[in-house]
Amino acid sequence: MIAMPSLHRLVALVLTSVSYAYAFTMPSLTKKQSYRLQALSHHDDRKTLPDFPTEITRRRALATAVVASSLVIPSLSDATNSIPFGASWRAVDGLNSANNGNFVSFDKSAYRAMRDDPTRTPLFEKAIIQRLGDDPESRVVLDLGTGPFALFALVAAERGAGKVYAIEANPEAAQSARDFVRKSGYQDVITIVEGYSTQVELPEKVDFCVAEIVGSIASEEGAYATIKNAHRFLREPTRPDSWIPRRIQTYAAPTSYTLHNLFGPPEFDWTKLDGEPVRFNCRDKGLELLSDPVLVEDIDFADIFSSAQTQRNAKKDLVFTVDLDRIEENTLNLFDEFRRDKRTSVKESEALAYQTAHSFTGIASWPRLILTDNLVLDSRTYPTGDHQKSHWQTVLPIMTERPIRGLKGNEKIKVSVDFILPEDVMISPRYRMEGVIEM
């Protein structure tokens, strides 16, 4: 039997190697950073990491990465004048059913995460109550994609809606929704309609539609094709207040990613992802933005026909400028994370924090929902894109085999974004991002 070194020893060995490498390659930190690092090295404050029971802590993930692979040491000399990157993928949010390759289903834990999101659910409830107004009994409501809990259908019924139709394509979720409606005593108000919304009919027109069919890239659950078809259910489909949300957006920004700096070839080959994005909890600080976010997708539900061509093929050419202030702040934040483990020295933590914060992995995306004129739901903070709790995820395609390192601030990141949104809800949206960094 070969004796394995302790995990602590492996971490120390790898981090020490990074420190020695940086003795030759890493510029001095700014005065602001040095003061902060010095102060941090003398206190033992251990802030609690986000509590998500289905996830391991980032510190454990980093330690596992060190065991599983060798660290790729940075080299500023690797940079050239113009470095290409890119990725393309097809939307799959959830699990494909074995019985239907086009059917996207969700397990109950995903539904519970949506239901229990402390920002999402209360804001949707507030928007529904506002729209029901002073005469809710006269309102006919559609809950498109009601899920196993018939959550928003029940909100409308409990607040006095005269009639609610709740469409659900997943047979198992539809049956669960019927059970919840029956147990709640609203079976005379709520009718569960099983099937794809594009393939069912309603006996009457509705006053407004609640459609929480928004992916972590806003369009990836087929919102474009679904809402376009759903116009036939509405009395006045071109009125903005006929829809909750009334528009959905996707924001994006270039990012650095900690594990991309720890995992590297040949032990770990990022190209095997074949463009498929990594998805992050929006509170995960292993992913840091390198510039301010920009709007890359904007789908107006009421106006979906008049601007359909623009929305179906959302092609944009973007230019991001790497923000030195963000890099410096990211370095400090990452250093703070690495120093949570007292066994790593200031020098070791400084080296890995610098390497990660000054690198580029890809273009991250996340959704924003405009529910009403005065209610907006953000998965990351707006407009800065900072971390916050959300059941939606931040989507990051790994766009290079190794991180592009040596960023100093003010580099131009030029990106061509192409979102292809099919007319048929049974065909998955496709996404492509490619560009160059001008060093």
Task: List the predicted regions and their residue ranges.
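Class I SAM-binding transferase module
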Residues: 83-144, 149-418, 422-438
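N-terminal secretory signal peptides and thylakoid transit peptides that target proteins
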Residues: 47-67
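Boundary at the C-terminal end of the N-terminal hydrophobic targeting segment
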Residues: 21-25, 77-82
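Hydrophobic membrane-targeting signal helices
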Residues: 20, 72-76, 371
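N-terminal export signals
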Residues: 60-80
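N-terminal chloroplast transit peptides
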Residues: 1-34, 39-47
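General secondary-structure propensity
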Residues: 9-10, 46-51, 106-110
